[in-house]
């Protein structure tokens, strides 16, 4: 709730709302998701006075209620707009309330962990790490590219050859560090 107060006090909240009204895509992860909703309620005083509530930015038709039990789990879910399976983790006290939302991201067990509005231009999720997935990230960035009049790339451009990267790192260390001196300093030689 402190983050919500801070962005409102600095005028950032108004700017986010104005950008969304102009059609700019807006995404919120976890606390950002809660901020995008209608209201954040704190009936147990986890982040403020017991029974406290703050109006959110009103961009998503949800209320987040902070519950005593914290959700802490890895999750696999389906992102509705892209049709892609996404993975990440949840770490939050929030529980969704509301109606009229588009369930944008749904876990395998049927729980909604992400909501979208304005035709998918505004969305939020409890799922941390969603952009770590190369295919999902490419889908999202391609959508932004199309909005700017650029052609989508259509495929992830990241290449991860960890073995080769570790070999290069090891060679660089061997070439530039006196390992025997380091071992002597730490008492291992």
Where are these regions (language model features)?
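Cysteine-nucleophile active-site neighborhood
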Residues: 1-87
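Amide-donor transfer/coupling interface in amidating biosynthetic enzymes
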Residues: 17, 21, 62-189
